[in-house]
């Protein structure tokens, strides 16, 4: 048994699993596995207080569900990372269509929570289709940008903008301004990396800023959150105040596992404010290391993406890592009271089935695009292949 297991990961193994293992970026794979593990660890720290707050008898209710979602997310990531770039495009096409179809139906059959209709509820679970739409959108617009560059009459840029505006319109109907901002940033990054003229990018940025400003006047919850951020003395800032106190209370080394006190007063401690739980129980050194781990994943992912030869693979992989990094940045910035509050999860760390599965899909797609293939990277042969036509 041991010899068979060893052979499965030997360089001479030509099975699908063996080829996957030796062509996948194992540094990124390991860093992602560490994030998933930390997410499960922190769920056991936050679950008792979260369960008690909403009257659930099983104090590890959220932790056990988190472990289930983390396992499912890991399996999804591994399966997706084995796909070819062509299969990634196909999967993104069908995922985007499915997610958009459900988002269109949400106003009629969706579950409303906190004034927004973003979820489909069934069999005790809730599904947020916009989470799956995000990586699919980035892959599709990257594909369209690449097709447009070929000069074969495909209106790639126009199709990419159409896909983007459809997604934005449906997000604003829910409403979900945070996800709109997130996909706009990732779309803009893909737009820039595709080599679009800077004047177009500046125009897109201007429109995006104008649109973001208009949400302050169009949506009451956005107006309220911005006002709380700008005038904390004149508004109820209980949650963000308690989160900040939790971070300060942890000091450098934290109170210790399970010893957090301030987390009991943070309503969304297991989701949006899990970072403050990490800081209180494990300290600033741990929470800074968590930021460093996210930075490693994003920076290494972007570095590898920039070395790819194929325009689609390069832009799509980079866009997916921007998506992950920006979401982590927004969540942590909210916890540190640097920006107005926004219900956005910390990738792989916060509790949430849709978020966990979608992040597994996102990183799986990115890992698949970064895999070592003949001709995928430069002629230097950095990854042992060299160009196919060399």
Curated annotation (Swiss-Prot):
Its main location: membrane. Pathway: Cell wall biogenesis; peptidoglycan biosynthesis. It catalyses: [GlcNAc-(1->4)-Mur2Ac(oyl-L-Ala-gamma-D-Glu-L-Lys-D-Ala-D-Ala)](n)-di-trans,octa-cis-undecaprenyl diphosphate + beta-D-GlcNAc-(1->4)-Mur2Ac(oyl-L-Ala-gamma-D-Glu-L-Lys-D-Ala-D-Ala)-di-trans,octa-cis-undecaprenyl diphosphate = [GlcNAc-(1->4)-Mur2Ac(oyl-L-Ala-gamma-D-Glu-L-Lys-D-Ala-D-Ala)](n+1)-di-trans,octa-cis-undecaprenyl diphosphate + di-trans,octa-cis-undecaprenyl diphosphate + H(+). GO terms for molecular function: lipid-linked peptidoglycan transporter activity; peptidoglycan glycosyltransferase activity. The keyword Transferase applies. Changing residue 145 to L: Decreases interaction with SidA. It is found in: Cell inner membrane. InterPro entries: FtsW, FtsW/RodA. It comes from the Bacteria. It is an enzyme of class 2 (transferase). It is a multi-pass membrane protein. One of its GO terms (biological process) is cell division. Keywords: Cell cycle, Cell division, Cell inner membrane, Cell membrane, Cell shape, Cell wall biogenesis/degradation, Glycosyltransferase, Membrane, Peptidoglycan synthesis, Transferase, Transmembrane, Transmembrane helix. Its EC number is 2.4.99.28. Pfam families: FTSW_RODA_SPOVE. The chain crosses the membrane at residues 27-47, 60-80, 91-111, 125-145, 153-173, 181-201, 279-299, 315-335, 348-368. Coiled coil: none annotated. GO terms for cellular component: cell division site; plasma membrane. Belongs to the SEDS family. FtsW subfamily. Interacts with FtsI, FtsN and the cell division inhibitor SidA. Peptidoglycan polymerase that is essential for cell division. This is Probable peptidoglycan glycosyltransferase FtsW.
């Amino acid at each position: 048994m041991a010899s068979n297991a060893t052979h499965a990961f030997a360089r001479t193994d030509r099975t699908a699993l063996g080829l996957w293992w030796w062509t996948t970026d194992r540094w990124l794979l390991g860093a992602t596995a560490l994030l998933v593990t930390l997410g499960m660890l922190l769920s056991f720290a936050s679950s008792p207080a979260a369960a008690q707050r909403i009257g659930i008898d099983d104090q590890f209710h959220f932790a056990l569900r988190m472990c289930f979602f983390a396992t499912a997310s890991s399996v999804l990531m591994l399966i997706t990372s084995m796909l070819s770039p062509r299969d990634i495009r196909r999967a993104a096409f069908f995922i985007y269509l499915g997610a958009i179809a459900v988002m269109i139906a949400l106003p009629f059959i969706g579950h409303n929570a906190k004034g927004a209709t973003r979820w489909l509820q069934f069999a005790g679970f809730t599904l947020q289709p916009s989470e799956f739409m995000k990586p699919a959108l980035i892959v599709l617009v990257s594909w369209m940008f690449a097709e447009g560059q070929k000069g074969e009459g495909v209106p790639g840029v126009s199709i990419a903008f159409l896909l983007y505006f459809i997604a934005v319109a449906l997000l604003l109907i829910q409403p979900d301004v945070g996800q709109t901002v997130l996909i706009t940033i990732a779309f803009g990054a893909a737009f820039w990396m595709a080599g679009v003229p800077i004047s177009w990018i500046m125009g897109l940025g201007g429109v995006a800023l104008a649109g973001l400003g208009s949400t302050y006047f169009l949506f009451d919850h956005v107006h309220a959150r911005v006002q709380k951020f700008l005038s904390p003395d004149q508004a109820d800032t209980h949650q963000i105040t308690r989160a900040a106190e939790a971070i300060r209370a942890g000091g450098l080394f934290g109170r210790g596992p399970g010893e957090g006190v301030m987390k009991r007063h943070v309503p969304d401690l297991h989701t949006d404010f899990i970072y403050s739980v990490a800081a209180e129980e494990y300290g600033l050194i741990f929470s800074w290391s968590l930021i460093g781990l996210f930075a490693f994943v994003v920076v290494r992912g972007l570095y590898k993406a920039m070395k790819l030869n194929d325009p689609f693979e390069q832009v799509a992989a980079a866009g997916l890592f921007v998506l992950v990094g920006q979401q982590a940045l927004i969540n942590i910035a909210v916890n540190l009271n640097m920006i107005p509050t926004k219900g956005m999860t910390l990738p792989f760390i916060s509790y949430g089935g849709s978020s966990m599965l979608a992040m597994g899909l996102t990183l799986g797609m990115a890992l698949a695009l970064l895999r070592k293939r003949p001709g995928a990277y430069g002629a230097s042969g950095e990854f042992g292949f060299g160009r196919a036509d060399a």
